[in-house]
Amino acid sequence: MPHHTASAESTGTAATRLAVRLLDAWSARSRAEPAGAELPSDPGVPVLAALLYATGDPEAERSAARAVAVWARDAGRGPAHCGLYDGGLAGTLVGLRLGAGVHPGLTPVADRLRDHLVRTAPTLGHRREQVAFPDYDLIVGPSGTLLALTAGTSPTPAQLGPFADHLTGLCDADALPRLRTGQYAGHPNLGWLDGRINTGTGHGVAGVVTALTAALRRLGPAPGPASGLAPALGRATRWLVRQSFDDARSIRTWDGAGLDDAPPPGGARARQAWCYGTPGVSWALWDAADALGDRETADWAAAAFTSLAERYDERFHLFGDRPSDLLALCHGASGVLAVADAFARHAALPAAAALRARLLTHLRTRLPEVAALGATGMGLLGGAAGPLCALLTADHDAARTWLPCLGLR
């Protein structure tokens, strides 16, 4: 339901005006410097433009149309892997699909790219053991590609099948041994994860769970090629539950990797975001349990999120040296806002509604910082497009068609 209050109306207007200004600046910048810092396939600009276009404001419509036209000119250039983020073609697909609401001529282009992603999926050689992120995750792997196929459209079983089958096969045992990484020994940033199983939404089991849930909602548990979906999803959700613990602030949470039968280190866990920790993981669990008809696990996941929502501390849980760490969807306040909004809307969770209200206020007062972030990046996950999309969706009842990009709905 829209939040019909003076503050919501003014925030919607302020967010819309800022989105127009940032999209216009991005369009001018991209024309002048087509090889800028941003990857051309990131869906942030067309996703924000689609939300802006739907407001019906003439200035917003013109800004959105310009931005989508400029974005489409270079869409698909860049790394061209099949992932949803980091320049992947699944991100291009989302941008084309939602951008088609602004420029309908992009629909057949999106259809051709969708067909390419489905056709080439069996040739990618995804590992089934000793995995790395591209073999399974939401950011650059098949979990994100599957979710991208569901954004703004209704994919067929044949289109989802190659990705759902692979992810189902990775969850064929209770301990999820196939999701144990094996490619990061000696890596300067990811060495900690080598030989372990990532729990998170972006790079871990929670992201796989969101993709399997999306597939189950569309394919159903009926006998046939998708018959293994529900058992695989059940195994993955039970594994995540077993990795949880209460931190020093009495928040039910998760570390970045599974516990491997060891007790968790003591202390409070500051990283509580979409990517890691309670927000993203508890949502993945709740939505999966809801799709499976598992009320006990759904209630458990809602209680886990409530433990965070009632103790969320912006001074502790939002940290980092970059504006994106504080504001963006991946690590920052807008990602927690998007999750709280999903819980409030779909689970009718009072603590989620209260946290949503707090974070709306938090972001309303930080639109100047969002503007500064937009001067350097308009990406969806790490740039200014994400906070603006989250604000327009949670506070101004904008379309939710982009939320599969986060494993939300």
Could you say what each language-model-derived stretch is?
Residues 1-32, 214, 218-220, 287, ...:
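Terminal, non-catalytic domain-edge segments
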Residues 1-8, 44-58, 91-104, 144-155, ...:
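Well-ordered alpha-helical scaffold segments within catalytic/enzyme domains
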Residues 2-5, 12-66, 70, 77-91:
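N-terminal domain-start signal
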Residues 14-33, 62-79, 108-129, 161-185, ...:
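Long, well-ordered core segments of solenoidal/helical folds
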Residues 24-43, 72-89, 127-139, 190-206, ...:
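Solvent-exposed loop and edge beta-strand segments that line ligand/cofactor-binding
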Residues 94-166:
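Internal, well-ordered domain-core segments that constitute the primary functional module
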Residues 155-296, 311:
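Extended ligand-binding clefts on enzyme/binding-domain cores
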Residues 271, 284-297, 301-313, 321-328, ...:
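Helix-coil-helix junctions within alpha-helical repeat/solenoid scaffolds
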